[in-house]
């Protein structure tokens, strides 16, 4: 399996279209934002990981996401992947990450220990703070 994309999002919707085919609608894709409350602030984002399973694979793997802040792992999520060979799938990951001050967290996403896809998110200071 391979990761096609990993993004921090506000919401996601899946819908059927003629074909039959499926559409994944992502809204509120983000790479930075102000903390909505004073720091320290605990953030629980939606990380959406889009995955493809080639037709010649069995459709079973494990997705690992390690979240790194200031060079230190602050959260880790491991979940099974089951995607029909030749198809696409999506996984949602919801960590809890506490920011003591503004900074950038990196989500390092990998399948079965393969090369990671890394996605940053920068937490900015609260507006007016």
Segments and roles (model prediction):
Residues 1-46, 125-129:
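Non-catalytic, glycine-rich low-complexity segments
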Residues 44-46, 84-94:
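Aromatic sugar-binding surface patches on proteins
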Residues 48-54:
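Short edge beta-strand/loop segments characteristic of extracellular beta-sandwich folds
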Residues 57-59, 101-105:
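Short tyrosine-centred short linear motifs in exposed loops/low-complexity segments
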Residues 65-69, 109:
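Conserved aromatic beta-strand anchor motif in extracellular beta-sandwich/beta-rich domains
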Residues 74-85:
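Solvent-exposed serine/threonine-rich low-complexity stretches and specific carbohydrate-binding patches
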Residues 81-82, 122-128:
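Short beta-strand edge segments in extracellular beta-sheet folds
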Residues 112-119:
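Short acidic/polar inter-strand loop motif in beta-rich domains
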């Amino acid at each position: 399996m391979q990761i096609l994309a990993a993004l921090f999002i506000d919401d996601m919707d899946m819908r059927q279209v003629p074909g039959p085919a499926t559409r994944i609608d992502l809204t509120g894709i983000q790479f930075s934002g102000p903390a909505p409350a004073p720091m320290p602030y605990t953030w629980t984002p939606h990380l959406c990981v889009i995955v493809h399973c080639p037709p010649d694979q069995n459709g079973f793997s494990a997705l690992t996401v390690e979240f790194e802040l200031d060079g230190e792992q602050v959260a880790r999520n491991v979940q099974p992947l089951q995607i029909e060979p030749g198809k696409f799938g999506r996984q949602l990951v919801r960590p809890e990450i506490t920011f003591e001050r503004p900074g950038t967290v990196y989500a390092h996403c990998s399948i079965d220990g393969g090369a990671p896809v890394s996605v940053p998110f920068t937490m900015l200071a609260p507006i007016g703070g």
